[in-house]
Amino acid sequence: MRIGLIEFLLILAIASLTVGPQVALFVDRWVRRANRANARAARRRAEYAAQAAAERDALLKRFRTASTVFGVIILLALAYALVFRPIDTPPQPYRAPDIRQDTGAVQTMLSDDSRDALALGDYQGVDCIRARDGLVYASAYNGATLKKRKSDLVRTDGGHTAAILSVDGELTGFAFDGSGELWLTVVTPAGGTLCRAASDSWGTAVEQVVTQIDGAPLGAVSAVETGPDGVVYFSVASGAATENGLEQTLRTELMAHTGTGCVYAYDLAARAVRKVLGGIAGASGLALSPDGKTLYVSDLGSRCVWAVPADARELTAGGKNCTAFLTGLPGYPGALAADEEGTLYISYRWARSSWLEKNAGSTLLRGIALRAGQNLQEKLFSLPTESPCAEAVTLQDGSWTRAFFARKAGSVTAVCPVESKVYFGTADVQRLPSANV
């Protein structure tokens, strides 16, 4: 039987009237169910997003709190390290020395000609220069830290160089006595030592003579001088520890100004030590007058040179029988040397620091600098080319004769007059530059 169009349409109409409401109801239920599922999913997503945002905010809050606490701890630790941390040499207030006026002395430049210099060798520092029998001797060292430092006593005549003696540590000074014996001051991490070098057919042996005073180890011994009567004078820069070498000890005393530097005399015949002078803010150099009756001592922190009788006992810098021979120096004096004609040569390690002396009466900033470490301290002091690296003065009347200048900046650690020349220990330790006088 064939179904026509009309019959087909009637069947569809009857089916739609019979089944349609149920289909519509099913679709409506399905749509509502889907909408409810979507709503629940949306709520869950919103809840998840809100929870994630809350967790993120809580985490950020905890992070900010932790960062604040950490920052406060760092600031407190920094404040403790720079301001409150105990140090071995707490700074002391002092009165800044006066500034000397221009002396009008002849200005002399150190020679740039290599022919005027004495070749030394590959070393990192020079602490002392002496001349004897036409030869020049220099104490030079290698080693960035004192624990690794080795020092040689180098002899040169301008053409040939030889290390005649070697010691562990820093050989800060040496001097020949009237009998030709060699006296040395050596600094090691354990402390300072006054030594004597004896030579025989087997070689040269170094004997420790003085290692402590009144049961306490010697500090950083900085210089040695021998008198015509056989007495050996030696200086201790300060009471600070010697673990970083002489230069750092002097720099520490310069900032702390503890006034614990001393000069001692060792009597070889009596095998006894007496204190000559105390209260020095960095005893950095010694020299004897040609007649051996007057001892000159450079005071680093006070920018002066003291003059005391060579046979003095228990004097105090600036006190009775201690004369301020030179004051208001333009730099911080180091090594001294006196020639037979009565001229005293003063070398300068650093130029006067206006920052340091501006804070002389206060200990806060100097204490911070002392706690800040060696790298920062090294940047506080320098010897620029416009400042004299050394000067010469007549011992008889204290008149200034020469001011020496170098074309390269750098501290001068040693000075030695030899006939018509003066040799210097400078930052260029490959050679010893000179100046004609």
What positions do the PLM features span?
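Membrane-spanning helices that line or support transport/gating and their immediate boundary helices
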Residues: 22-34
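Sequence-structural signature of mature extracellular/luminal beta-sheet repeat domains
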Residues: 71, 77-437
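N-terminal intrinsically disordered, acidic low-complexity segments at the extreme N-terminus
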Residues: 33-51
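Hydrophobic single transmembrane helices highlighted by the model
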Residues: 1-25
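Exposed, low-complexity/repetitive linear segments and helix-based recognition motifs
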Residues: 4, 44, 52-54, 336
